[in-house]
From Swiss-Prot:
Residues 212-249 are annotated as: Disordered. Gene3D superfamilies: 2-enoyl-CoA Hydratase, Chain A, domain 1 (3.90.226.10). The keyword Plastid applies. The active site is at 107 (nucleophile), 132. It is found in: Plastid, Chloroplast stroma. Belongs to the peptidase S14 family. This is ATP-dependent Clp protease proteolytic subunit. Component of the chloroplastic Clp protease core complex. The gene is clpP. Its main location: plastid. Keywords: Chloroplast, Hydrolase, Plastid, Protease, Serine protease. InterPro entries: ClpP, ClpP/crotonase-like_dom_sf, ClpP/TepA, ClpP_His_AS. SUPFAM superfamilies: ClpP/crotonase (SSF52096).
Length: 249
């Protein structure tokens, strides 16, 4: 029996919280998660998926360019050019992009994990990263000129991938070149050591997401209590700094 897309009840603005669930609007789970600016890649990377993710990042940036984006990744990789579309969008949008690796982060998925905002690249403790060089499928039926042209394109992508890894990680060039020659798997600890991620664990970040989601809901509620009085705490040196991001484990 297929699992299907789960749906959850969602109350529109102005609806009473104690309304019956039958009167609520049922929407896809991901549509509600998008309200917390959480984006998910849970499939192989191809152009349809890449266009969806890039478009969502751009829309959320237009909606609010000051709030973080949270990009959850669990993918076996996929098309290099489609992955580069997502990577370029991550660098283009104004909000900082958290990348959160869960499960397997192979090939182009590991490249996207590296592409997150520096100090905001996280990974689950039981995840696995796999890196290798870009490749193209050739057969004996391919024309030699076509193979030669494709080889040049693959080499250009390989140089670009190496440049990004060298700029955004602590991988020495010699080590990186050696690892790219084959499928090289890393644990979360190894990925942190090489600078592919900045920290391990996302528990505190999930708590922050819940808090931000609640604050957004209160901003739409005219009966919500006025929290402006809390700004007086800024005059108290012992008051907790609520604007400071939580320390990530």
């Amino acid at each position: 029996m297929p699992i299907g897309m789960p749906k959850i009840p969602f109350l529109l603005d102005g609806d009473e919280e104690d309304e019956e669930e039958d009167d609520a609007t049922w929407v896809d789970l991901y549509n509600v998660l998008y309200r917390t600016r959480s984006i998910f890649l849970g499939d192989a990377i191809h152009f349809e998926v890449a266009n969806h993710i890039a478009g969502l990042m751009i829309f959320l940036t237009i909606q609010d360019a000051t709030q973080n984006l949270y990009f959850f990744i669990n993918s076996p990789g996929g098309l290099a050019v489609a992955g580069l579309l997502i990577y370029d969008t991550m660098q283009y949008v104004t909000p900082p992009v958290y990348t959160l690796g869960l499960g397997v982060l192979a090939s182009m998925a590991s490249f996207l994990l590296v592409g997150g905002e520096t100090s905001k690249r996280l990974m689950g403790p039981n995840g696995r990263v796999m890196i290798h060089q870009p490749e193209s499928d050739y057969t004996h039926k391919d024309q030699s000129l076509e193979v030669q042209l494709d080889s040049g394109e693959v080499e250009d992508i390989r140089k670009m991938v190496i440049r990004v890894y060298l700029e955004r990680t602590r991988l020495p060039r010699e080590v990186l070149n050696d690892h790219l020659e084959r499928n090289y798997f890393m644990t979360a600890t190894e990925a942190k050591y090489y600078g592919i991620v900045d920290d391990i664990g996302i528990q505190n970040l999930l708590a922050r997401l819940r808090a931000e989601s609640a604050s957004q809901d209160n901003s739409l509620d005219p009966d919500a209590p006025d929290e402006s009085a809390s700004q007086d705490n800024s005059l108290d040196p012992d008051a907790p700094d609520e604007t400071r991001p939580p320390k990530l484990r």
